[in-house]
Amino acid sequence: MTEGVGLPLWLLAELTYRCPLQCPYCSNPLDYAQHKNELTTQEWFDVFDQARQMGAVQLGFSGGEPLVRQDLEQLVAHAHQLGFYTNLITSGMGLTEQRISHLKQAGLDHIQISFQASDPVVNDALAGSKHAFEQKYEMCRLVKKYDYPMVLNFVIHRHNIDQIDKIIELCLELNADTVELAICQFYGWAFLNRQGLLPTQEQLIRAERITNEYREKLKAQNHPCKLIFVVPDYYEERPKACMNGWGKIFFTVAPDGMALPCHAARQLPISFPNVREQSLSRIWYESTGFNHFRGDAWMPEGCRSCPDKDRDFGGCRCQAYMLTGNASNADPVCGKSPYHQFIEQARAESEIDSSLEKLVFRNSRNSKQFTVQQNIPVQNIVDD
């Protein structure tokens, strides 16, 4: 099937599921500890070569923590030689001035650093790692020193949303060019911890108001910092155009070579191919996994006849699966969906107090307690 299928313009290389942090909102699979057979340097080179030949122009290095890979500089250099625009999506852990210098020499175009909170104690508690805030702060200084645009990402949830003003002040202190204030998206570990992470509607309204006030102040000062506020699906009435449509632009390769239309799709009961076994071209154009939700033939009648289907492409398939057990169902976020009550229930649950200590942290010991059939941890463990 090639007719009407666009080019895979954006390649996400999930280099590893390994990570020194333990964020309870990580979007990696719950059972990530089972997937250890990472692609080699040469195998990634081959993936980049094929993707570029197919028309891919942007390449994101993600994880886990991509800096865990000691061949990252080699991968960046190869991608740069091919003509990719390259973006490193990192926690900053494992970054040093020497590595930034080497990445700059290799041709890396862009670095995005994530924080957990503006307060060092809360930041390190959410990260499950001592001195994480200190490391991130110092790396932001070095990113500026090496003339990279300062792009910061904060995942916003009920445990840090009330400090949104302090978060923005920290970003201004670090001379950020772009700040993404992204309300938690509930996939992977975040979905497991949803009740303890989803902000209340009152919290959300206040945070958006404060963000808009800062935008006005910055505009009046002709300040270059751009604030991006990403509202969670759970407080919308229409679904997002997830990944700009299934298999339309985005091509994700997981650490073990599994090819996915989006990084969350691994959980779906669909057979996805592996780049070790099939060419990227065959995967993109011919595989069942990438063609499964293309077009509108798969849509239930209410979605297929909806005038918004060409805008939202039916919403998020992973969200439909997580909330209803069937990836073909109408996205529950949609107010027209017969499953919208699941979203309303989640909103109601957000009003229940939940402490930071109740969150299940993302680490190998917790991951090993999960299976594909039963995603329930036996006990929560925070690694020292």
Swiss-Prot record:
Q: Which residues cross the membrane?
A: none
Give all residue intervals belonging to the Radical SAM core domain: 5-220
Q: Which cofactor does it need?
A: [4Fe-4S] cluster
Pfam families named in the record = Fer4_12, Radical_SAM, SPASM
Cofactor binding mode and count: Binds 1 [4Fe-4S] cluster. The cluster is coordinated with 3 cysteines and an exchangeable S-adenosyl-L-methionine.
Q: SUPFAM superfamilies recorded for this chain?
A: Radical SAM enzymes
The protein's matches in InterPro entries, at most eight in alphabetical order, are given as: 4Fe4S-binding_SPASM_dom, Aldolase_TIM, Elp3/MiaA/NifB-like_rSAM, MoaA_NifB_PqqE_Fe-S-bd_CS, PQQ_synth_PqqE_bac, PqqE-like, Radical_SAM_PqqE_MftC-like, rSAM
Catalyzed reactions per annotation: [PQQ precursor protein] + S-adenosyl-L-methionine = E-Y cross-linked-[PQQ precursor protein] + 5'-deoxyadenosine + L-methionine + H(+)
GO BP terms: namely: pyrroloquinoline quinone biosynthetic process
Q: In which pathway does it act?
A: Cofactor biosynthesis; pyrroloquinoline quinone biosynthesis
The Enzyme Commission number assigned here is 1.21.98.4
Show the GO MF annotations.
4 iron, 4 sulfur cluster binding; cyclase activity; iron ion binding; oxidoreductase activity; S-adenosyl-L-methionine binding
Keywords, alphabetical: 4Fe-4S, Iron, Iron-sulfur, Metal-binding, Oxidoreductase, PQQ biosynthesis, S-adenosyl-L-methionine
Q: Which sites bind [4Fe-4S] cluster?
A: 19, 23, 26
Q: Which family does it belong to?
A: Belongs to the radical SAM superfamily. PqqE family.
Name the job this protein performs.
Catalyzes the cross-linking of a glutamate residue and a tyrosine residue in the PqqA protein as part of the biosynthesis of pyrroloquinoline quinone (PQQ).
Q: How does it assemble?
A: Interacts with PqqD. The interaction is necessary for activity of PqqE.
According to UniProt, the name of this protein is: PqqA peptide cyclase
